[in-house]
A protein has these predicted regions:
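Glycine-rich oxoanion-binding loops at beta->alpha junctions
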Residues: 1, 43-76
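Short, acidic/small-residue loops that bind anionic groups at enzyme active sites
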Residues: 38-49, 84, 98-125, 141-142
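Active-site/ligand-binding-proximal alpha/beta "capping" segment
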Residues: 64-112
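Glycine-rich, charge-decorated loop segments at or immediately adjacent to ligand/cofactor-binding or catalytic sites
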Residues: 25-30, 119-133
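SAM-dependent methyltransferases
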Residues: 146-147, 153-206
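Short acidic-hydrophobic, aromatic-tinged amphipathic segments that line or gate anion-handling sites
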Residues: 60-69, 145-156
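Glycine-rich beta-alpha loop segments
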Residues: 1-43
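Conserved thiamine diphosphate
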Residues: 73-83, 132-151
Length: 206
């Protein structure tokens, strides 16, 4: 119900859902958003999987032969990510997404790992990153800020909405990085940005 409820809440605000088009959580996301607000990116496998009935036959359903092209579409065409507990494929997609964000190889986007009520899947996973991966220097402590772990659907929705409250988009023009905002920062806010992040600028300031 979490995937369905979250997708329904986002669709009500004009968002569209894109999932792997399979059964279970993937189907729940499309059911919640509704066929008219959904895309499906299925994978062709010898023993599975048929697209779920909520998207089957829809022109917004595509089928991929390779997992890597499927991941490319899911990441490239999404403005936010909500990940629920799953198997190797879920973890593979999650780690690739975080690696791309960590290294600036994809656009900044909000990422939420949605825990089942009372569950420990993502909490234990996050603890493993914090206690085993970060202390060894394989990731930085601040890499854990790339995502939010919660079991609250409303908090997940708020995280995605809040990310785009002022941020609009980002792009490179030659050697210049342009960040588009809905509201320009005040002089005081700009001064603080230069204090906190001015070292990111090759010359001058932000």
């Amino acid at each position: 119900p979490q995937a369905r409820d979250l997708a329904a809440a986002m669709a009500a605000e004009g968002w569209m859902a894109i999932t792997g088009a399979g059964p279970g959580i993937m189907a729940a996301g499309i059911e919640g958003a509704g066929r008219e607000h959904s895309f499906g990116v299925n994978i062709r496998l010898p023993h599975e999987q048929e697209p779920n009935p909520f998207i089957k036959g829809d022109p917004k359903l595509v089928a991929m032969k390779y997992f890597f092209t499927r991941k490319l579409e899911l990441i490239k065409e999404s403005d936010g990510f909500v990940v629920l507990p799953g198997g190797f494929g879920t973890l593979d997609e999650s780690f690739e997404l975080l690696t791309l964000l960590q290294n600036g190889k994809t656009l900044p986007t909000p990422v939420v790992f949605l825990e089942t009520p009372g569950g420990t899947y993502w909490d234990e996973w996050e603890s493993f990153l914090a206690s085993e991966i970060a202390p060894r220097g394989y990731i930085h402590d601040h890499d854990l800020d790339l995502f939010l772990v919660t079991e609250d659907v409303d908090e997940a929705v708020a995280e995605i909405r809040g990310f785009y409250r002022n941020y609009h988009s980002i792009r490179w023009t030659g050697a210049t990085l342009i960040i588009r905002l809905r509201t320009a920062p005040t002089d005081a806010e700009l001064a603080q940005l230069n204090v906190d992040f001015g070292d990111l600028a090759a010359t001058g300031g932000i």
